[in-house]
Amino acid sequence: MTIIRVKENEPFEVAMRRFKRTIEKNGLLTELRAREFYEKPTAERKRKKAAAVKRHYKRIRSQMLPKKLY
């Protein structure tokens, strides 16, 4: 549970911004969206496998030497 203490004479907008920032750092919004609907275990494995493959190809692409431009 995220708790934000509002300081004296602190505008509401600033406190709200701090609250949103802490929630984003904790990853609560992403977890909430993931748990909003039930996902079958097979679908979850498939999604995670696809994400791993995507990360792998992205890592390989970043390590490749750039082609010569001439």
From Swiss-Prot:
MF terms (GO), sorted A to Z: structural constituent of ribosome
Entry GO terms, CC: ribonucleoprotein complex; ribosome
The answer, when asked if Ligase is one of the entry's keywords, is no
A GO biological process this protein is involved in?
translation
* Highest taxon of the lineage: Bacteria
An example of a Pfam family matching this protein is Ribosomal_S21
What does the similarity note say? Belongs to the bacterial ribosomal protein bS21 family.
| Full protein name | Small ribosomal subunit protein bS21B
Origin organism is Burkholderia mallei (strain ATCC 23344)
The gene designation is rpsU2
